[in-house]
Amino acid sequence: MNLHEYQAKALLKEYGMPVQEGILATNADEAVAAFEQLGGKFAVMKAQVHAGGRGKAGGVKVAKSKEDVIEFANNIIGTRLVTYQTDANGQPVNSIIVAEDVYPVERELYLGAVVDRSSRRITFMASTEGGVEIEKVAEETPEKIIKVEVDPLVGLQPFQAREVAFALGLKDKQIGQFVKIMTAAYQAFVENDFALFEINPLSVRENGEILCVDAKVGIDSNALYRLPKVAALRDKSQENERELKASEFDLNYVALEGNIGCMVNGAGLAMATMDIIKLYGGQPANFLDVGGGATKERVIEAFKIILADTSVQGVLINIFGGIVRCDMIAEAIIAAVQEVNVTVPVVVRLEGNNAELGAKLLDESGLKLISANGLSDAAEKVVAAVKA
């Protein structure tokens, strides 16, 4: 679950981190009032969406007058912002931040942290190249990225934060400020189950103060049950409708940009299914794992979610029966096809527990389903059906 910039800043401020002050506005009148509250001379206005690249997409603008504020607010609130991190439909802009003037600045730095699954530790990253996409820095000048792994048994140590401060070229009182910021960031990360944390830019002002000008926070969705305060910040309007619907039925669904819908039980098999579809020249439209304990109802909902994607031109159902019986899956497929107006080819591959019984049920259903013998055969058939 992602947070908006204003939500992330408010959360980090609770941990004592110095953040750029901003006022949320949902219409032009509120934006003008916020602009005047901040002095009425200069402000930065930022569209609030769950995506990076807002500046290049027209989602960030400097305002030097009330007219600038009114124009920006009227033009962007209620629209959808398309950036390099969104799909072609973009994300809805329901509000903007009118933020205080923090310029000029002496330097712009980067500070971020993720859970590194290879080392099984929280890893901090810092760079002198703030204000630009960290992915671009990693690709073009990886030597400019400083990494620090945190031992979960002892947590972030002050000496680690100081080493990063020295590597960033900070001096005198700036070192102490940075240590406090990095320590607070680690505390917020652990206590709120962050999956991702970024301050970009972390600005060094001309007066020597360090300030968090932007903030990006992603929360581990699996931890929301123990984070009621954070869970209340969820903005469902920013989430993919199909992914949101899938979460209600405990389905693991991720929308992709292909045209072949996939329904599989097991994450590993689902990834293998997507790989083999691509091997045969197709493009998967989604990742969908119905899970090892899939019920008939969940399979029906999974089918509906797949077909709700208008780009889907074919469906591959790949089930390996273990805990899940193939005959139960077959019954669910039949029920779903009968309930939903299916106009695309559906290829079904069943293996394992009661696979023969499941195949028999499908054959006797009278529905236009394409049976497959093996994964390669299934992938070849669905790609051919879509291209036909």
Curated annotation (Swiss-Prot):
Succinyl-CoA synthetase functions in the citric acid cycle (TCA), coupling the hydrolysis of succinyl-CoA to the synthesis of either ATP or GTP and thus represents the only step of substrate-level phosphorylation in the TCA. The beta subunit provides nucleotide specificity of the enzyme and binds the substrate succinate, while the binding sites for coenzyme A and phosphate are found in the alpha subunit. Belongs to the succinate/malate CoA ligase beta subunit family. Binds 1 Mg(2+) ion per subunit. Its EC number is 6.2.1.5. Its cofactor is Mg(2+). Mg(2+) binds at residues 200, 214. Substrate binds at residues 265, 322-324. GO terms for cellular component: cytosol; succinate-CoA ligase complex. It comes from Acinetobacter baumannii (strain ATCC 17978 / DSM 105126 / CIP 53.77 / LMG 1025 / NCDC KC755 / 5377). InterPro entries: ATP-grasp, ATP-grasp_succ-CoA_synth-type, ATP_grasp_subdomain_1, Succ-CoA_synthase_bsu_CS, SUCC_ACL_C, Succ_CoA_ligase-like_bsu, Succinyl-CoA_synth-like. ATP binds at residues 46, 53-55, 100, 103, 108. One of its GO terms (molecular function) is ATP binding. Pathway: Carbohydrate metabolism; tricarboxylic acid cycle; succinate from succinyl-CoA (ligase route): step 1/1. GO terms for biological process: succinyl-CoA metabolic process; tricarboxylic acid cycle. This is Succinate--CoA ligase [ADP-forming] subunit beta. Residues 9-245 form the ATP-grasp domain. Gene3D superfamilies: ATP-grasp fold, A domain, ATP-grasp fold, B domain, Succinyl-CoA synthetase domains. The keyword Metal-binding applies. It catalyses: succinate + ATP + CoA = succinyl-CoA + ADP + phosphate; GTP + succinate + CoA = succinyl-CoA + GDP + phosphate. Coiled coil: none annotated. It is an enzyme of class 6 (ligase). Heterotetramer of two alpha and two beta subunits.
